[in-house]
Amino acid sequence: MAKLTKRARLIREKVEVTKNYDINEAVALLKELATAKFVESVDVAVNLGVDPRKSDQNVRGATVLPHGTGREVRVAVFTQGANAEAATAAGAELVGMDELAAQVKAGEMNFDVVIASPDAMRVVGQLGQILGPRGLMPNPKTGTVTPNVAEAVKNAKAGQVRYRTDKNGIIHTTIGKVDFETVQLKENLEALIGALVKAKPASAKGVFLKKVSISTTMGAGVAVDQATLAKAL
C-alpha cells in the first residue's frame, strides 16, 4: 500500500468528509492545508438538481465576482471598426478579424478569453473546432458574443467567471486565490451562488443547490454549509 504524503495525511486528519462546514471555517481549513509552493486557486464545485441530459436544464452563464479571481486575464476580441478601437481602449490584448483568425489557426493562442461582436461570427465560426474544445468559443449566454465588446472586455478583466453544467450536473469554476481574505472568498462564492439561483431552469424540480464544495488546486474538497451563505440564497 502506497504511503500517504504529508499533505494527504494532514487532509485526512483535518477534514471530516461527512461534515458541512461553516464557510468561514471551510476557508480557514483550505488556508491551513494549502502547502504548495505557489499561490493556489480556490475552486468550487456546485452539484445542481438538474437533469443534464435535458437541454432545457443545462445551466450556463457568467458573472463578475466582486473581488475578481486573482488571475491576469488576456483577452482576444474579434471585431472591426469603432468596436475594435473601443476593445483596445478597454484593455484587450488582441483585436482583429481575419488576421486574428489566421493566428488562431496557426496555433498562436496567447489568450484566456475570446469575445466577438455579432458581425464577426462569420469569422469566428470557422474556428469552432479549435476554440470549442478549449472552452473558448464565444457564446451569447456567457456575454462573449455582444455588440458592446468594450463592456465585455472590462468584465473579463474585472474577474468574470463563466460556468456550465458538466455531464453530471456539476458546475466547476474558480472563486479566487488562497491568499484572498476570507470575506473576499465568501463574497465571491455568494455572488456565484446568487447567479446560479437566478439561472435555475423552470423545469428543474426538487432541491436545486444539492451540494457546494470548495477546494484548493492541490487540496481536497470541503463541503460548505449553505445556511452560512444565506446572503446569496
Swiss-Prot record:
Record's GO cellular component terms: cytosolic large ribosomal subunit
Pfam families: Ribosomal_L1
Keywords, in A-Z order: Repressor, Ribonucleoprotein, Ribosomal protein, RNA-binding, rRNA-binding, Translation regulation, tRNA-binding
UniProt-listed GO biological process terms: regulation of translation; translation
UniProt-listed InterPro entries: Ribosom_uL1_bac-type, Ribosomal_uL1, Ribosomal_uL1-like, Ribosomal_uL1/biogenesis, Ribosomal_uL1_3-a/b-sand, Ribosomal_uL1_CS
Domain of life: Bacteria
Gene Ontology molecular function, alphabetical: rRNA binding; structural constituent of ribosome; tRNA binding
CDD domains listed in its UniProt record: Ribosomal_L1
Function (record text): Binds directly to 23S rRNA. The L1 stalk is quite mobile in the ribosome, and is involved in E site tRNA release. Protein L1 is also a translational repressor protein, it controls the translation of the L11 operon by binding to its mRNA.
Family: Belongs to the universal ribosomal protein uL1 family.
Oligomer status and interactors: Part of the 50S ribosomal subunit.
Stated name of the protein: Large ribosomal subunit protein uL1
Taxonomic source organism: Shewanella woodyi (strain ATCC 51908 / MS32)
Encoding gene (name): rplA
